[in-house]
Amino acid sequence: MDKSPEVLLELVERLGNLLRAEFRRAGADEQLQPVHVHALVYLTRANRYSNTPQAMAEYLGLTKGTMSQSLLLLDRRGLIERYQDDLDRRVVRLRLSTSGEQFLYDAQPQSAWQHATRNISPNRIRNAVSALRETLTTFQADNEGQPFGSCSGCRHFERLSARAYRCGLMGDRLSGPETRKICWLYEEKGAGGEEEEE
């Protein structure tokens, strides 16, 4: 088996191209581009600190202008809703509308991936996730990109009890489902100059 990083790159590129084709197919009936479908999927995965145009643009690697145009189109199609932050009225937040949720349910843009990985053992999936996560983390650090991640791996995550959680950075209580969503305030445990306890 070839173990070179170049083969990994070729495989990731090929998978990315195939997934883009799936996202293009998923959006075809609504005349949406893959970037629009990616934006909708992002909103299903983003937590309350990450559902802003700025965070979405960072995650998707888009310019402010491209993101703005994409959101205008999704808003006009009734697939997203914009609302003001409760604490800071200057901040615009985004969420899927009922139509947006229905679109993703009907289109199932990730079903091809689920089908393709159905026979891979959980252990092999874990190993692949670990290798790809390490590659992504290094790539983002080298390019000064925002890492994004879920609460359980974040240095700000505080477990108050078996079912009570808190974001130490923002000071907010978190629900169980929230702790599994992605956050752009994420900092890997041990990051930021703090030593991890042994």
Name the predicted role of every residue range.
Residues 73-125:
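Charged, amphipathic alpha-helical coiled-coil/dimerization segments
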Residues 22-33, 114-123:
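Short amphipathic alpha-helical boundary/capping segments
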Residues 1-30:
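N-terminal leader segment of winged-helix/HTH proteins
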